[in-house]
């Protein structure tokens, strides 16, 4: 099992949660294919909207990749099903020194520019607890 951090503005995250899907890096297939059923997924949203949204810098949704193959939507974008759990949006700032992904890295924002990053179980568990989604790690 792997854990993924996907970087998407909050408005798109909320739409994905509503639809029960994940779509990464503008809907390309490669990122979606790396995910497998049971993988953890957490969204980080630097802004509320893109490109004109307000700064946010929060983890905005969390769940697990569902047992369904990726599919291409009617608009040509690749998606996977996700089972999201209720969670509270959580700022990243208080966690920067605790997360293996960002600890000791002043330029952690550059990592996020990749759009999809594999994260450790430690980081996924910490984020899940902070978001009140402990059921994902129990």
What are these regions (language model features)?
Residues 27, 33, 51-57:
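Alpha-helix N-cap/loop-to-helix boundary motif
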Residues 115-138:
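Charged phosphate-binding loop/patch that engages nucleotide di/tri-phosphates or the phosphate backbone
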Residues 10, 47, 86-88, 123, ...:
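A broadly conserved detector of short glycine/acidic/proline-rich loop/turn motifs that flank catalytic sites
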Residues 45-51:
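Short, charged beta-turn/beta-strand-edge "cap" motif at the junction between a beta-strand
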Residues 1-37, 131-138:
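Compositionally biased, charged N-terminal/linker segments
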